[in-house]
Amino acid sequence: MFWGCFSYDKKGPCYCWQPETAQEKRIAEQEIEQLNCQIEQSLRDQWELETSMRRVNLRRQPAGKKPQWKFTKKTGKLSRGGKGGIDWYRYQKLILLPKLLPFAKECAIERPGTLVQEDKAPAHNHYIQQRVFDLQEVSRLL
C-alpha cells in the first residue's frame, strides 16, 4: 500500500507500506504498555469526574452499586487489533511523527493557518492521534 501527502504547491514525503515483522510487533507491544502507564492516571481522573457528575442526584440516591474503575479499551486503554494491516500505532510511528507533521509545519511557515486533512480511516481517526497533533501544534480536519 502507498501513502503520500502534498500541498497546493509542494510535494510531500511518501511511503510504501511493508508487512510488519514479529520483532516490530514485540517492540510495539512494549511501547504501547509504556504509553498505557503514562496515560492511565489522567484517564482515570477524567472517568471519576464524569462518573461522579453522572451519579449526582439531589432527590434520591442513585440505583445500583457504585461503578469501579477498570482500565479497558472502553475507558481508553491503548491496544492493537489482531488482524494486521495499518493500525493507529504503525501510522503514528511510520507516517505521522517522521513524515506528515514535519511537512505540515514546513507548509505552515509559508502558509499560516495550514490544516492537515485526512479521511476517517481507523488509523487516522483514533483518539490518540489528536493528542499527537495537539502536542505538535498542528491543526487537522477529519
Regions found by a protein language model. Name each.
Residues M1-L142:
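Surface/interface recognition patches
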